[in-house]
Amino acid sequence: MQWSTLVATAVGTVLGVLATLVADHVRWRRDRSERDRDTLRTACTEYLTALSTAKDAFSRAEPSPEHVGKGHVAIGEHGVYAAQHQLELVAQRSLVDKAGRATFSVLDFHDAVVAGHATDSQEYVNAWRAARHTRAALIKEMRKALQSV
């Protein structure tokens, strides 16, 4: 029996196994990356939906000075905090920070509405614009995070 045939067969087998392992590892990483992106996309979507629902509800709220400063209760009822906690589990720190700022800006908007400021008042307009601006910055950060996953 020739040793060269056995060695060539062994080397070919080892190379075949290594190539299969490398291909499986690459496939696993790609699948994991896709799952991570889907998880992050879902968390972002749920948070934005909850935040928008809360802001829309607040814009229709009746003036009630005793509710000023109590927006955290109302925002919790719309699922914003639950969605924000979910986002905190899967997102980068910069995204979580912008989500927190967006939540605070919606709380400020709530306070402007329940304080009785008219929709054309400077306080209302400033709060509405701040909420819109922080939401836009958040969406930009979400897009950046989704591209990097």
Sequence positions of predicted segments:
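Feature marks short, highly hydrophobic, charge-poor N-terminal signal-anchor/signal peptide-like helices
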Residues: 1-11
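Conserved non-transmembrane functional hotspots
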Residues: 18, 22-149
